[in-house]
């Protein structure tokens, strides 16, 4: 027989027309004008190869024409239905009925001489059927109905011979070239290239290229390229490229590219790219890219990109990008990007970006960005940004930004920004900004900004700004601004601005502005402005402005302005303006203006202006103007003009003229002329002319001219001209001109001109001009001009101009201009201008300008300008400008600008600008700009811009921009832009842009752009499984399984399985299985199976099976099977079978198709003026007459 040609059987109508309208010739050549080399029925000629296979496409009409054509084997493409083939051209060699065509083909099979012979040796023949390229994506299709098998051999054997030739029934079909060996049992088909060996059991199908070896049990299907080796048990299907090796037990399905090796147990499924190696136990599913290696025990599911290695125990699930290595015990779930390495014991869950390494104990959860390394004991949870390293014992929870290193003992919690290093004992909690180092023993809590170093003993709490170093014993609390160094023994509390150094004994409290140095014994309290140095023994209290030096014995109290030097014995109290020097024995009280020198015996009280020298005996009171020298005994009052020198004891009253020097005791009244220097004790009243210097104790009233210097005690009122310097005690009111310096104790009110320096005690109110420096005690209110420096204790309110530095205690409110630095205690509110640095303890509220750095404690609210760095404690709210870095503990809310990095703890809400990196704890809400990276735990809600990567835990809601990659736990809701990749757990809802790739559990609702599975916009194509819901815009194409619901706009195509509901606009095409409901607009085409309901507008075409209901508008065409109801408008054509009811408008045609046992015949009626009445239902009665369907109690009317 000729090996180059094959015979194909098909049927046409009695006019030789096929279903596409092509008229076949009675003999000669026929060719398709619209040929396409695909495995679909359209765009080509189709038929039954050698007349054996499915009967679904052969006409059952009695007048059908049965055509036999001769086709070149090289042109044949096999279709999915048994025996069906497709070809572009053919030669018609026979036209007749079913029996004659069957005899014709059987005779040609039996007679080798009936066709032209080839030069090859005759062999048992089968027709090679070239296999087209298989698409890399397999679309789900509706369940196909089963049809009877047609075989020309059985037809020829059953029919009476008519000029018969001998008829034979082929049991095997074999085709091979030279050097091949083929051996097959009954009903097998073997096709091989040269040099191949094929052995098959019953009902098997083998196809192989040259040099291949195929061995299969019964009911198997093998396809391989050249040089391949395939061995399969019964009921298996193997497909491989050239040079591959496949071995499978019964019931397995293997697909591999060229050069691959696949070994599978029973009932397994393996898919691999070229050059891959796959080995699996029973009931497993393996999918790998080219060059991968996968090994799995029974019940496992592995998916990997090209070049990957996966090893899994029983019942495990592994997903990896290309070049990854995964090893897991039983019941584990591993997900990794390309180039990653993951190793896990049983019951673990690992998720990592590309290039990561993850090692986990039993029942652990690891999430990491690309390039990270994670190692954990059992029952641990680790989350890390890209390039991080995390090591944890059992029961720990670690979260870190990219490039970080975390090491934790059992039951610890670590949170760090990118590039940080954290080491903790058991039961500890560490939070750090990027680039920080934290080391803590068990039970400690550490919070630090970026670039900081923290070392803590047992049960300690440390908070630091960026670049700080903190070392503490057990039970200590340390708070520092950026660049500070703090060292404390057990039970101490230290707070410092940036660049400060604090050393404290046990149970001490230290507060310092930036650049200060503090050293104290146990149970001491030190407060200093920036750049100060304080040294105190146990039980002392020191307060100093910036640049001051304070040395105190036990139980002493020192207050000094900036640049002062104070030395006191035990139980002393010293107050000095900036640049002063004070030396006192035990029990003394000294008050001085800036630049003064005071020396006092025990229990003395000295008050001097700037640049003065005061010497007093026991319990003396002296007051002098600037430049004066006063010496007083007990209870003297001294009054002197400027440049004067006064010496007085308690109870004296001193008045001095211009340039005088006055020294007076307690309760004195001093009046001085222009340029005078006055020093007064308790309850004094001082009045001085222009350029004077005044010094007074508590309850004094000072009035000075322009350029004066005033020093007053508690509850004093000071007024000074331009360029004055004022120092006041408790509850004082100070007013100064431009460029003044003011120093006051608690509850004082100070007003100063431009460029002033103010120092105030507890509950003071300070107002200063541009460029001022202010230092205030507890509960103070400070207001300063541009470029000021402010230092205040707790509950203070500070307002500063541009470029200021503010340091405040507990519950303070700070407002600063552009470029400021602010440090505040517990529950503070800070507001700063552009480029500021802010450090605050818990429950603080910080607002900063562009490029700021903020560090806040527990429950704080931070707002920062563009390019800021923020570090906050537990339950904080952070808002930052473009390019910021934020680090926060649990329950925080973070908002950042473009390109930011955010790290947040449990239940946080993060919003960031374009290109941000966010890491959040459990139940967080994340929103990020274009190109962001987000990592979140269970129950989180993530929103990201274009090209983002988001990883979230269970019950999360993710929204991402164009081209994003989202990974989430079960029951999640994901929304992504164009071209995104989404992976979600069971019962998830996914919405993605055009061309996305979605992976989800069953019963999910998916909405996606063109090429994805679910809801899509205009012009999209949706493909879904059974029981799906699809909603699409105009000109869409929807494909779904049985039981689905489809809704689309006009000019759409809808395809669904049985039991579906379809709704579309005008000019749409709807196809559905049985028991379906279809509704479409005008000019639509509807096709449905039995027991369906079809509704369309005007000029539509409706086709239904048996027991259907069809309704359409005017000028429509309706066709249905038996027992159907057809209703149409005017000028329509209705075709129905037995038991159907037809009703149409005017000028319509009603056609009833009846089967008389031999052939179909038609009864036709027309509606209108010359026909039957329109809009009346008609049917065919038992006498084959068309009658209208009667209502109840009406007689039927026969239509003639």
UniProtKB/Swiss-Prot annotation:
Protein name listed in UniProt: Ice nucleation protein
UniProt-listed InterPro entries: Ice_nucleatn
Highest rank taxon of the organism: Bacteria
Physiological role: Ice nucleation proteins enable bacteria to nucleate crystallization in supercooled water.
A GO cellular component entry from the record: cell outer membrane
One annotated GO molecular function: ice binding
Miscellaneous comment in the UniProt entry for this protein: A structural model is suggested in which the ice nucleation protein displays a symmetry related to that of ice.
Intracellular or extracellular location(s): Cell outer membrane
Family designation: Belongs to the bacterial ice nucleation protein family.
UniProt region (Octapeptide periodicity), positions on chain: 176-1151
Natural source organism: Pseudomonas syringae pv. syringae
Pfam family, one: Ice_nucleation
Note on domains (UniProt): Contains 122 imperfect repeats of a consensus octapeptide A-G-Y-G-S-T-L-T; further on a 16-residue and a regional 48-residue periodicity is superimposed.
SUPFAM superfamilies: Phage fibre proteins
Keywords: Cell outer membrane, Ice nucleation, Membrane, Repeat
PANTHER family in the record: KERATIN-ASSOCIATED PROTEIN 21-1-RELATED, PTHR31294
Biotech / industrial applications: Used by snowmaking industry to promote ice nucleation for artificial snow and economize water. Sold under the name Snomax by York.
